[in-house]
UniProtKB/Swiss-Prot annotation:
Pfam families: Cytidylate_kin2. ATP binds at residues 7-15. Signal peptide: none annotated. It comes from Methanococcus aeolicus (strain ATCC BAA-1280 / DSM 17508 / OCM 812 / Nankai-3). Keywords: ATP-binding, Cytoplasm, Kinase, Nucleotide-binding, Transferase. It catalyses: CMP + ATP = CDP + ADP; dCMP + ATP = dCDP + ADP. GO terms for cellular component: cytoplasm. Its EC number is 2.7.4.25. One of its GO terms (molecular function) is ATP binding. It is found in: Cytoplasm. Belongs to the cytidylate kinase family. Type 2 subfamily. This is Cytidylate kinase.
Length: 178
């Protein structure tokens, strides 16, 4: 089973991916964690590393390569904004692909709480990060991250609590597996 889950920062992808991973006994691989680890290794913050990645496409290519390689082994929940795109570009079809969305201010509040930052700081960082990623994805892969047509399921994660979002996805996986 290969499950991809994507969404902009603050939509709950990591929380949901962990729940899916635990329930179905799948490996959980998060592109964002790989990106953060690379930033830390280079002694940079996330914003600074995002700008660095704009000038150094090898960063994104390495993350993508790792994701595709791991997905080919199966039994995985692959979390990342480009996870579904990268698999499909490499002729690997996910069992199910999910995109989580939520209004900007809801996402900002979640990020602010998670990062222990004030709302304005979190909003500024969120906007800068999203703009940087959108630009990189377009330039590197000609991917419009706003095109959600490749996903099986799109869920507004602000409309339900975590248990509700997970329940919807769990039922979809169970029905897809039959």
């Amino acid at each position: 089973m290969i499950i991809t889950i994507g969404g902009l920062p603050g939509t709950g992808t990591t929380t949901i991916a962990k729940l899916i991973s635990e329930k179905y006994n799948l490996n959980h691989v998060c592109a964002g964690f790989i990106f953060r680890d690379m930033a830390k290794e280079m002694g940079m913050g996330l914003q600074e590393f995002s700008k660095y990645a704009e000038e150094n496409p090898n960063i994104d290519h390495e993350i993508d390569r790792k994701q595709v390689e791991l997905a080919k082994e199966g039994n995985i929940v692959l979390e990342g904004r480009l996870a579904t795109w990268m698999l499909k570009k490499n002729s690997v079809e996910p069992t199910i692909s999910i995109w989580l969305r939520a209004p900007s201010m809801v996402r900002c509040e979640r990020i602010s709480e998670r990062e222990c930052e004030d709302i304005n700081t979190a909003l500024n960082k969120m906007i800068n990060r999203e703009n940087s990623e959108k630009k990189r994805y377009k330039e590197l892969y000609d991917i419009n991250i706003d095109d959600l047509s490749i996903y099986d399921i799109i869920i507004n994660s602000s409309a339900w609590n975590i248990e509700g979002v997970f329940s919807i996805i769990d039922r979809a996986i169970a029905n897809k597996s039959k």
